[in-house]
Design a protein with these regions (language model features):
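Extreme N-terminal, non-catalytic leader segments
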Residues: 1-29
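Hydrophobic anchor at the beta1->P-loop junction of P-loop NTPases
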Residues: 32
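The conserved Walker
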Residues: 36
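Conserved lysine of the Walker
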Residues: 40
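Conserved substrate/cofactor phosphate-moiety recognition/catalytic segment
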Residues: 45-90
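Conserved beta-strand scaffold positions in the cores of enzyme catalytic domains, especially
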Residues: 60, 126-130, 172-174
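ATP-dependent NMP and nucleoside kinases share a basic, alpha-helical "lid"
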Residues: 69-76, 92-150, 157
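Small-molecule kinase domains that catalyze NTP-dependent phosphoryl transfer to phosphate-bearing small molecules
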Residues: 132-135, 140-188, 196-199
Length: 199
């Protein structure tokens, strides 16, 4: 939030509700959290394609992509990770005002950071999806070798190895990617989203 009292929000002629009615669905943020390699981005992008094919306004905010632009100046230190989540949350909130279903795929390992995201976006527009998978399976999926480098000490502050991951306490949906196929996960997530955004 800006500390400058001379800056005030401007409300235009078109409301969020007007946009949602035109597009035939509510906007909301579906926040995918889980270890690297758990399947967050894969599921989010597959769901995005299906919803897009159904003519819905939908967009994936992917951790790697955001790090190339909006948050390219940030490190992976704890304070920088928090700022990363704060920026993403503020942008996602703007997309919600534009009647877009936002699929945010970020490790976001700390409970406090995810709570901050919920508070920025608004409790009524925020749904937490816990994409869970055993660490050893995530490591097996790691084609880039980041887990191996983290275990060798070549990468610092790597979630699950040298930095903590705090699992959600009460997620809105749990997806166990070691126990179901990608198609099953995508179907469950899509059905959950459609239930939440129907008008």
């Amino acid at each position: 939030m800006s500390g400058n009292k001379n800056i005030q929000k401007f409300r235009g002629e078109v409301s969020r509700e007007d946009r949602e009615n035109i597009h035939g669905h509510r906007a909301a943020v579906f926040w995918f959290t889980g270890l690297s390699g758990s399947g967050k981005s894969t599921i989010a992008h597959a769901v995005e394609k299906e919803l897009f094919d159904d003519l819905m306004r939908v967009y994936v905010f992917d951790g790697d992509n955001v790090r190339h632009g909006l948050c390219a100046d940030l490190s992976f230190a704890p304070t920088a990770r928090t700022e990363n989540i704060r920026r993403i949350s503020e942008v996602a909130k703007l997309f919600v005002e534009n009647s877009t279903v936002c699929l945010c795929a970020f490790i976001s390992p700390l409970l406090s950071d995810r709570q901050m995201a919920r508070e920025i976006i608004g409790d009524n527009d925020f749904y937490e999806i816990f994409v869970t998978c055993p660490l050893e399976v995530c490591e097996e999926r790691d084609v880039k070798g980041f887990y191996k480098m983290a275990r060798e000490g070549k990468i610092k502050n790597y979630t699950g190895i040298s930095a903590p991951y705090e699992a959600p306490e009460n997620p809105d949906l749990i997806v166990e990617t070691d126990k179901e196929t990608l198609e099953e996960s995508v179907t469950r997530v899509k059905e959950f989203i459609l239930q939440k955004v129907k008008i």
